[in-house]
Structures are given as structure tokens and as C-alpha cells.
């Protein structure tokens, strides 16, 4: 880690450090919200209102995926930061490699389970016969592109832990801008005319672009993350438990948002059904 980042984490005035790290993190959080907003705007213009409803049904799935990725990312970042303070390079390395291993495995499992039980899951989340087709089209593509997305979330937390919050911010900006550019090209008839599938594809490509940027930063000589791809497959069960336990509160907090959306979707569906029955 270079002297400037070392000073930031260990010597610089606390207020200055908080501002330096908090501003990029805040911008990154705002940018995160742009993904679904941009998809919704372009889908509304390029497809129809039913497709917008489908994105709302699909949103809890993405929130749950994000909750898992943040659990791993925040848990590993916390362990990495404490190890860095102790100058414990072995624990720093194990926390990073284990987090990446967990990201790949968890993402693969969620993708497979999600693709197999997608329609049943969406009906549980409040989908109707009108919008479930759009939701399936959207999530079939999103789930396939899950691994780079999860790794991007994990690496963003880890680069923040080593004092490079700007890298995480730029990664998110790259993803958001790429999504904004690709959405109309893939969705509208003057482009590829793929509709909801186009929105999902644009999102996946945007996330891949963001992942490539943060991954290159993470393996650069300036980074202290010490990613060793050759040993990535080696399982450290003790570290898996540590990361999961440390990040579990974050998982619960983020997953609760997904369950709230699911509850609202089902209430809306129930009201709509009751209204149709009453009008008939």
C-alpha cells in the first residue's frame, strides 16, 4: 500500500479520513440505485406498463442476491481491515481469497437454484399471469450473469477496506454509465429490439465492465489484497465461518428490504384480484 493510503488509514486526522472515504462510498450507493431506475425508465418507454411491473417483481430476487454478496464483502472487508492493522499478512490473504471463493460458489448455487425454480419463486414473490413472462425473461439473463456481479460487490468492499474508496466509486460509475448507454440500444426497436431481455443483457454487460475495472485494480501492484488465483480453490472453512458471522447482520438488514418488497407485491396482487372479482 503506498504512503498516501497508509497515512489515510493510520495517521491522518480522523475527520479528514472519514470525509475522504465517505464521499466516494455515498456516491457509489446512489449510483447503485440507478441500475433498476434506468431499466424501469427505458422498459416503460420501449415495452409497456406490464413489463415495468415485472421488473418490480424481479427486484426482490436481485436484493437477496445483493444481500448475500454484501454479507461476504462486508464480512471479509472487516476481517481484512483488522488484519491490516495488526500487519497480519496471512489473515489478509486468507480473507480475500476465501471471500472470492465464497462469491463464486454462492453465485453459482443461487444461479442454478434460481433458474430451476424461477417461475415458482416469482409467483411466491407476487407475480401474476400477466407479468410473470416478462419477469422470467429478465431474470433468466440476470441469473446467468451473477458471478461477475457478486465478485464486483465483494471486491468493491475489499478495495474500500484498503483505503481506495475511489476505485469502488469509479467501478460503480462505469457500470451505471454502461447500463445507460446499452439499455436503449438493446431495448428499443431501432436497436436490437429485445425489450425486457435487452434491459437484462445491458445490466449484465454493465456489471461485467464494472467487475473488470475493480478486478484489475485489485490485482495491481498498488493493491495489498494479494489475490492468488492459483490457490483460490483451496477451502478455508474457519475463514468461511468468520466471514459469514461478521457479515450476517448486513445480510439480515438487506434481506429485510427484499422481504418488504415481496410483502407489498403480494398485497397489491391480492387487492387486484379482489377488485377483479368485485367488478365481475
Task: Annotate each predicted stretch with a short phrase.
Residues 22, 26, 30, 64, ...:
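Residue-level signature of the transmembrane alpha-helical core
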Residues 34-37, 46-49, 83-86, 161-162, ...:
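Helix-loop interface residues and adjacent transmembrane-helix termini in multi-pass membrane transporters
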Amino acid at each position: 500500500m503506498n504512503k498516501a493510503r497508509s497515512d489515510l488509514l493510520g495517521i491522518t486526522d480522523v475527520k479528514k479520513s472519514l470525509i475522504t472515504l465517505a464521499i466516494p462510498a455515498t456516491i457509489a450507493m446512489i449510483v447503485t440505485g440507478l441500475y433498476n431506475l434506468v431499466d424501469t425508465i427505458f422498459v416503460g418507454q420501449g415495452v409497456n406498463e406490464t413489463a415495468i411491473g415485472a421488473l418490480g417483481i424481479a427486484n426482490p430476487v436481485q436484493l437477496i442476491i445483493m444481500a448475500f454478496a454484501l454479507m461476504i464483502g462486508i464480512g471479509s472487508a472487516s476481517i481484512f481491515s483488522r488484519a491490516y492493522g495488526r500487519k497480519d499478512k496471512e489473515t489478509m490473504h486468507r480473507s480475500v481469497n476465501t471471500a472470492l471463493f465464497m462469491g463464486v460458489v454462492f453465485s453459482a448455487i443461487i444461479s442454478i437454484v434460481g433458474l430451476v425454480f424461477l417461475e415458482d419463486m416469482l409467483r411466491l414473490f407476487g407475480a401474476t399471469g400477466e407479468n410473470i413472462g416478462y419477469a422470467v425473461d429478465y431474470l433468466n439473463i440476470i441469473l446467468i450473469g451473477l458471478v461477475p456481479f457478486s465478485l464486483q460487490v465483494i471486491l468493491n468492499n475489499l478495495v474500500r477496506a484498503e483505503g481506495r474508496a475511489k476505485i469502488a466509486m469509479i467501478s460503480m460509475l462505469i457500470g451505471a454509465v454502461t447500463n445507460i448507454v446499452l439499455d436503449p440500444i438493446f431495448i428499443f426497436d431501432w436497436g436490437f429490439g429485445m425489450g425486457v431481455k435487452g434491459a437484462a443483457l445491458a445490466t449484465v454487460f454493465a456489471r461485467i465492465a464494472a467487475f473488470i475495472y475493480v478486478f484489475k485494480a485489485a490485482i495491481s501492484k498498488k493493491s495489498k489484497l494479494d489475490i492468488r488465483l492459483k490457490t483460490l480453490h483451496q477451502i478455508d472453512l474457519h475463514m468461511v465461518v468468520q466471514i459469514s458471522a461478521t457479515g450476517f447482520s448486513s445480510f439480515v438488514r438487506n434481506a429485510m428490504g427484499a422481504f418488504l418488497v415481496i410483502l407489498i407485491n403480494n398485497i397489491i396482487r391480492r387487492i387486484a384480484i379482489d377488485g377483479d372479482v368485485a367488478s365481475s
